[in-house]
């Protein structure tokens, strides 16, 4: 039988930094934030992460007005008012001390934000280049893809994930609101949650 402390640690709400490549993908990030709103995890970001995702989205989608991007950031801040973290000088110095390339120094703020927030996870994509730096910084922080993070959450916070999925599906703007269409949407490139979609397919009666 599990001791209460062990059970509580398994079900504790984790903090996860959402990196700019994740926030740039609006469909994906909105799905993740529905899970967060349902209590599956607490999101973390920083002013610099906001600057990066808005800049990247302007480059990828120049037709989107700058005012719309400002509104999106304001909506994120209103929905999660304690998510924005200012990286401490000590954390920044610790990370930068182990950076040897310009790419590492450019991304150092993401790890410094995670350290300052005491986050357990950084959710990013394959562009994240601090694996070697992280091996030298003695902190237990995982770097996961959005799909891997959702799979972890399904294992640890199943009820909250399913509640978040229900809320996302209810708010989903897709024309066909069937469960099959929604799961196909998760698998499609704009979300890219193929393993998560496969796993959620077994919970379709709860979605």
Q: Model regions: which residues?
A:
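Metal-dependent nucleic-acid phosphoesterase active-site entry motif
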Residues: 1-30
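PIN/NYN-family metal-dependent endoribonuclease catalytic core
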Residues: 15, 26-63
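Acidic, metal-coordinating catalytic cores used for nucleic-acid/nucleotide bond scission
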Residues: 22, 92-106, 127-131
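Amphipathic coiled-coil/heptad-repeat helices and related helical stalk/stem segments
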Residues: 28, 106-107
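Glycine/small-residue-rich phosphate/adenosyl-binding loop
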Residues: 67-77
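Acidic catalytic patch
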Residues: 76-100
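Acidic, metal-binding active-site segment of PIN/NYN-like and related structure-specific nucleases
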Residues: 107-142
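Acidic, PIN/NYN-like endoribonuclease modules and their adjacent C-terminal/linker elements
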Residues: 128-207
């Amino acid at each position: 039988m599990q001791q209460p402390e062990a059970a509580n640690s398994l079900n504790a709400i984790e903090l996860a930094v959402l990196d700019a490549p994740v926030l740039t993908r609006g469909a994906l990030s909105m799905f993740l934030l529905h899970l967060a709103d349902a209590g599956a995890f607490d999101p973390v970001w920083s002013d610099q992460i906001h600057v990066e995702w808005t800049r990247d989205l302007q480059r990828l989608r120049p037709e989107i007005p700058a005012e719309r991007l400002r509104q999106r950031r304001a909506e994120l801040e209103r929905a999660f008012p304690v998510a924005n973290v200012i990286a401490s000088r000590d954390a920044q110095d610790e990370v930068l001390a182990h950076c040897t390339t310009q790419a590492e120094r450019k991304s150092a703020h993401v790890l410094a934000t995670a350290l300052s927030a005491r986050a357990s996870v950084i959710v990013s994509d394959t562009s994240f280049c601090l694996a070697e730096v992280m091996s030298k910084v003695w902190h237990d922080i995982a770097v996961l893809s959005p799909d891997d993070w959702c799979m972890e959450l399904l294992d640890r916070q199943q009820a909250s994930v399913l509640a978040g999925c229900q809320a996302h599906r209810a708010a989903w703007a897709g024309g066909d609101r069937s469960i099959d269409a929604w799961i196909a949407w998760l698998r499609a490139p704009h979300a890219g949650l193929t393993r998560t979609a496969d796993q959620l397919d077994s919970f379709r009666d709860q979605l």
